From Swiss-Prot:
The keyword Magnesium applies. Pfam families: SpoIIE. The gene is PTC7. GO terms for molecular function: metal ion binding; phosphoprotein phosphatase activity; protein serine/threonine phosphatase activity. Its cofactor is Mg(2+); Mn(2+). This is Protein phosphatase 2C homolog 7, mitochondrial. It catalyses: O-phospho-L-seryl-[protein] + H2O = L-seryl-[protein] + phosphate; O-phospho-L-threonyl-[protein] + H2O = L-threonyl-[protein] + phosphate. Mn(2+) 1 binds at residues 109-110. Induction: By the presence of non-fermentable carbon sources and oxidative stress. Its main location: mitochondrion. The lineage of its organism: Eukaryota, Fungi, Dikarya, Ascomycota, Saccharomycotina. Protein phosphatase which positively regulates biosynthesis of the ubiquinone, coenzyme Q. Dephosphorylates and activates the ubiquinone biosynthesis protein CAT5/COQ7. Also dephosphorylates CIT1 on 'Ser-462', which leads to its activation. Keywords: Hydrolase, Magnesium, Manganese, Metal-binding, Mitochondrion, Protein phosphatase, Transit peptide.
Length: 343
């Protein structure tokens, strides 16, 4: 923690961040276009970091979900009734469990910048999670299709379905999906800046990496009409148009009592992994018998910090580095977590 004296307050939920740095236009919504092609390069594959655990027999998993949407009193949201009704805001999630030994889970975060242009930013993340839930359920019920049960393929199949069905007119979303199989070999596919972390004895032992084209501009799966693409081209801009093939893939061997967290950037923009470690250590007793209460308390704590104008959030510190000015304050955003415990 650093001293708050001399720090400008960060109020990202209300509009532009005012400062002397002219290249910083607005931090209130994430970007869905870029003036240049991404400079991010990824090998799209990450191997095991740990050898197989000693646990015998099939792994068992317990899950909990907690979320809190940000306040939607801005006029732009009043015009988007579906967005207001979404209980998770622009975030969405799914958890598919045919039995306690085989689980799929994921979160998706609709890119909020579209709301400023009159589009429901929650639509694409909601439809994507709905399709990922349907696909993972159908595949899990058919053991002969076990080879198809990869998170990356689930993202790809779901994205193809929502494009074909044309329910979503405009939007962009991140996506992270994890498979928790009976052998404990965690598989994760991530596209964008949502996050997965594995904690062992309250210490981080594995995490995914963010994919971005720039500050506050994540990789995203987008649906954009042709006329909007042409208009962007006339302006000399480019929308961020990723495909499921761009998702990074990870694998990691779990052990009994591991805690796994899938989270949208409402968490990681506010707190660091050190903070999560401290929270899990302070609430170790609840990880055994009160996973839902633990998850909700975690979200409540992050929400409180996101509304604190004096809190030195991760987001505020990044802005300080970019601008050379000292900013403080949490970043108000939708916050969603899926928490999994290995039993």
């Amino acid at each position: 923690m650093f001293a708050n004296v001399g720090f400008r307050t960060l109020r990202v939920s209300r509009g532009p961040l005012y400062g002397s740095c002219s290249q910083i236009i607005s931090f209130s919504k994430r970007t869905f276009y870029s003036s240049a092609k991404s400079g991010y390069q990824s090998n799209n594959s990450h191997g095991d970091a740990y050898s197989s655990g000693s646990q015998s027999g099939p792994f068992t998993y317990k899950t909990a979900v907690a979320f809190q949407p940000k306040d939607r009193d801005d006029l732009i949201y009043q015009k988007l009734k579906d967005s207001i009704r979404s209980p998770t805001g622009e975030d969405n999630y799914f958890v598919t469990s045919n039995n306690v030994h085989d689980i799929f889970a994921g979160v998706a975060d609709g890119v909020g910048g579209w709301a400023e242009h009159g589009y429901d930013s929650s639509a694409i993340s909601r439809e994507l999670c709905k399709k990922m839930d349907e696909i993972s359920t159908a595949l899990a019920e058919n053991s002969s299709k076990e080879t198809l049960l990869t998170p990356k393929k689930i993202i790809g199949a779901a994205y193809a379905k929502i494009r074909d069905e044309k329910v979503v007119k405009v939007g962009g979303t991140t996506a992270i999906v994890a498979h928790f199989p009976s052998n404990g070999k965690l598989e994760v596919a991530n596209l964008g800046d949502s996050w997965c972390g594995v904690f062992r004895d309250s210490k981080l032992v594995f995490q995914t990496k963010f994919q971005t084209v720039g500050f506050n501009a994540p990789y995203q799966l987008s649906i954009i009409p042709e006329e909007m693409l042409k208009e962007a081209e006339r302006r000399g801009s480019k929308y961020i148009l990723n495909t499921p093939r761009d998702a990074d893939e990870y694998s990691f061997q779990l052990k009994k009592k591991d805690i796994i967290i899938l989270a949208t950037d409402g968490v990681t923009d506010n707190i660091a992994t050190d903070d999560i470690e401290l929270f899990l250590k302070d609430n170790a007793a609840r990880t055994n018998d009160e996973l839902q209460l633990l998850s909700q308390k975690f979200v409540d704590n992050v929400v409180s910090l996101s509304k604190d104008p004096n809190y030195p959030s991760v987001f505020a510190q990044e802005i300080s580095k970019l601008t050379g000015k000292n900013y403080s304050g949490g970043k108000e955003d939708d916050i969603t977590v899926v928490v999994v415990r290995v039993d």
